[in-house]
Amino acid sequence: MLSTLYQNDLKKKRNRRRNRSAALVCCPQKEGSVLKPRIVTPKKPNSARRPVAKAKLTNKKFVVAHIPGTGHNLRKHSTILVRGGGCRDLPGVRHTCIRGVSDFLGVRDKTKRRSIYGIKRPPEMAKRVRRKFRAIFGQ
């Protein structure tokens, strides 16, 4: 049987996938400025005080972004870089701030998982230079 035009239109709409971080508009990250850093509580089975920041992105959209790690230095008008992917138990939080970029400092005294928390390699963890290259690199 032939389908009507309305039925064809329904089939097209059904296949579309919802974009979870629509505010980024096909970009991996966007820069923005903090409007209000605050603390929110998670959904029912969990109990905590999670820091989030309401931010205005460079494309004039407003998002609520999760602040990862312990402690932060964000104030009003701080510049942050935001990526997709929020906190599962915080409703309405669909983005995450990236640490160690622009005004947002990395977590202090962190040695493991440094790339997540924006920390450079400390000098005591420097790579060992192979013997045949020591003359070149001066070690």
Swiss-Prot record:
Q: Which PROSITE patterns match?
A: RIBOSOMAL_S12
Renumbered to this chain, region (Disordered) spans 1-21
Segments forming a coiled coil: none
Question: From its record, what is one biological process in GO terms?
Answer: translation
Domain of life, source organism: Eukaryota
Any one annotated GO CC term: mitochondrion
What are the Basic residues biased-composition ranges? 11-20
Its biological purpose is as follows: Protein S12 is involved in the translation initiation step.
Query: Of which family is this protein a member?
Result: Belongs to the universal ribosomal protein uS12 family.
What is the protein's name according to its record?
Small ribosomal subunit protein uS12m
